[in-house]
């Protein structure tokens, strides 16, 4: 039943997406036909960097992200952007486009393209707020257990009021363990916010997110596994996967993991120190044998 509802939500989101694009095409002031519209320079620029301006559906919320493809020519506000964290969403409205949109031979081709490129996990999208062009960065991680994407993380960039053509960090909802300001300074030096540098910055943040995500997923995927007839059961894991406790049969094991190299640096077995599990977390299942014999 839940799967049927999820599919229905996807269909409805896709229909809204198609309707939005139809309106944008109808409002386009170019001489192109409905099925042949030009790709704006901004799109060409980012496509060359393998970057996309996505407005795709998601299953977890009202997920159609309507964007203004001509951010310097605001249109009629249609509501708040859906799918953005509440700390960010209140700062933005959505404007309908009045200029050319990405040029594909059909609306279906356009939607299919956006669905495919968003799978890479990192995407950019333009946002218009109070006649000012902002840039959004969307970071998405895939949950291998639920076979769904987690709710996205967002970073919003604003144009500098002091330096023409320079972007500045505005708002974000990244976890505290992501050194976003350090990454921004490292890549851009606060002076070079070229398209390629913005993508490098986004990829650096995504890499940090993915590292923690993969570590947590690793421990969660062990749930229910057996070692010599003793079942693994996860009891506790923090949001970074650094402090983990689990049951192996009747035994309670607690470990601490180093964030830098994913090495287990401390281990207790039923409350007593044990060095048998020290080493890479990804070899932990092989080392279980040494503590349960």
UniProtKB/Swiss-Prot annotation:
Residues 1-31 form a coiled coil. It comes from the Eukaryota. Transmembrane segments: none annotated. Residues 107-293 are annotated as: D-RWD. It is found in: Nucleus; Chromosome, Centromere, Kinetochore. GO terms for biological process: cell division; centromere complex assembly; meiotic cell cycle. Belongs to the CENP-O/MCM21 family. Component of the heterotetrameric kinetochore subcomplex COMA, which consists of AME1, CTF19, MCM21 and OKP1. The COMA subcomplex is part of a larger constitutive centromere-associated network (CCAN) (also known as central kinetochore CTF19 complex in yeast), which is composed of at least AME1, CHL4, CTF3, CTF19, IML3, MCM16, MCM21, MCM22, NKP1, NKP2 and OKP1. COMA binds the centromeric nucleosome-binding protein MIF2, and to the outer kinetochore MIND subcomplex. The D-RWD region contains a double-RWD domain which is involved in the interaction with other kinetochore proteins. Component of the kinetochore, a multiprotein complex that assembles on centromeric DNA and attaches chromosomes to spindle microtubules, mediating chromosome segregation and sister chromatid segregation during meiosis and mitosis. Component of the inner kinetochore COMA subcomplex, which connects centromere-associated proteins and the outer kinetochore. COMA interacts with other inner kinetochore proteins to form the inner kinetochore constitutive centromere-associated network (CCAN), which serves as a structural platform for outer kinetochore assembly. This is Inner kinetochore subunit MCM21. It comes from Kluyveromyces lactis (strain ATCC 8585 / CBS 2359 / DSM 70799 / NBRC 1267 / NRRL Y-1140 / WM37).
């Amino acid at each position: 039943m839940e799967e049927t509802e999820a599919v229905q939500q996807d269909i409805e989101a896709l229909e809204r997406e198609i309707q939005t694009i139809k309106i944008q095409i109808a409002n386009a002031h170019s001489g192109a036909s409905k099925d042949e519209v030009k790709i704006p320079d901004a799109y060409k620029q980012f496509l060359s960097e393998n970057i996309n301006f996505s407005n795709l559906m998601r299953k977890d919320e009202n997920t159609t992200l309507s964007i203004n493809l001509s951010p310097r020519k605001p249109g009629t506000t249609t509501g708040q952007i859906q799918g953005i964290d509440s700390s960010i969403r209140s700062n933005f409205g959505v404007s309908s486009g009045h200029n050319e949109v990405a040029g594909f031979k059909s609306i279906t081709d356009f939607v299919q393209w956006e669905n495919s490129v968003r799978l890479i996990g990192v995407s950019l999208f333009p946002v218009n707020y109070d006649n000012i062009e902002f840039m959004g960065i969307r970071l998405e991680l895939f949950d291998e257990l639920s076979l769904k994407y987690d709710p996205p993380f967002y970073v919003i960039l604003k144009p500098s009021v002091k330096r023409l053509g320079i972007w500045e960090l505005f708002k974000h909802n990244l976890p505290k363990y992501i050194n976003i300001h350090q990454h921004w300074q490292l890549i851009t030096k606060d002076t070079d916010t070229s398209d390629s540098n913005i993508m490098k910055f986004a990829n650096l943040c995504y890499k940090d997110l993915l590292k923690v995500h993969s570590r947590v997923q690793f421990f969660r995927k062990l749930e229910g596994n057996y070692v010599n007839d003793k079942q693994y059961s996860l009891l506790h894991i923090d949001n970074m996967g650094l402090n983990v406790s689990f049951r192996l049969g009747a035994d309670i094991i607690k470990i601490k993991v180093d964030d830098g190299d994913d090495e287990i640096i401390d281990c207790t077995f039923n409350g007593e120190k044990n060095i048998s599990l020290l080493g890479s977390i990804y070899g932990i299942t092989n080392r279980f044998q040494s503590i349960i014999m």
